[in-house]
């Protein structure tokens, strides 16, 4: 039982799976997370992963599923194992947004797997990924570094009108106003 729209996770580019899952997604008015791998596994080549994502998006459209209901996971790889993993992920995310106009998601902590100071790396990656067009991420909202990076990236990208979320998270009214709070500060200026 759920409220809103169901989200079917991990639909890969395997033809057999697409023909089974996509009709069910359409029938139930669900959205789908498209995973950028197929029968051959996960390619390290970002062009191959993009092509698989494009195939899934096109196949979904053939079944009447709108692009807005397809969220692509470009499969972020660990930078400790693949030196160019960050550049590859950012390239794919940018192309998915610009060329296909789809929403994206990723397991953000995959990027830092096996490395120290994972929150620091994940924060840097997330800020850059948002800049490239990432629209959602699976991450730990309890890590302050990650939250700061996401909120900051949203400010930089113009996704936080009037910096409302940033201010709501970080403003300390009493300290910003010399201990008088917001109202005290305003009154102090009018005297």
Where do the model's predicted regions map?
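Catalytic alpha/beta core domains of metabolic enzymes, predominantly
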Residues: 5, 20, 25-178
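Terminal amphipathic helices with adjacent charged low-complexity linkers/tails
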Residues: 1-4, 17
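Acidic, His- and aromatic-enriched active-site or binding-groove loops in soluble protein domains
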Residues: 10-15
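Arginine-glycine-rich low-complexity intrinsically disordered regions
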Residues: 179-191
């Amino acid at each position: 039982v759920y409220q809103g729209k169901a989200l079917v996770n991990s639909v890969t580019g395997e033809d057999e799976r697409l023909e089974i899952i996509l009709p069910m997604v359409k029938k139930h008015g669900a959205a789908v997370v498209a995973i950028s791998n197929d029968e051959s596994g996960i390619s390290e080549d970002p062009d191959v992963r993009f092509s698989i994502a494009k195939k899934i998006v096109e196949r979904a459209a053939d079944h009447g599923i709108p692009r807005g209901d397809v969220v692509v996971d470009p499969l972020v790889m660990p930078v400790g194992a693949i030196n160019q993993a960050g550049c590859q992920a950012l390239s794919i995310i940018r192309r998915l947004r610009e060329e296909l106009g789809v929403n994206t998601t990723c397991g953000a902590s995959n990027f830092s797997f096996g490395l120290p100071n994972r929150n620091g790396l994940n924060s840097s990656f997330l800020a850059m990924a948002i800049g490239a067009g990432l629209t959602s991420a699976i991450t730990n909202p309890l890590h302050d570094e990650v939250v700061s990076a996401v909120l900051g990236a949203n400010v930089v990208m113009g996704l936080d009108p009037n910096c409302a979320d940033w201010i709501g998270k970080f403003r300390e009214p009493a300290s910003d106003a010399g201990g008088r709070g917001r109202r005290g500060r305003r009154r102090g200026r009018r005297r």
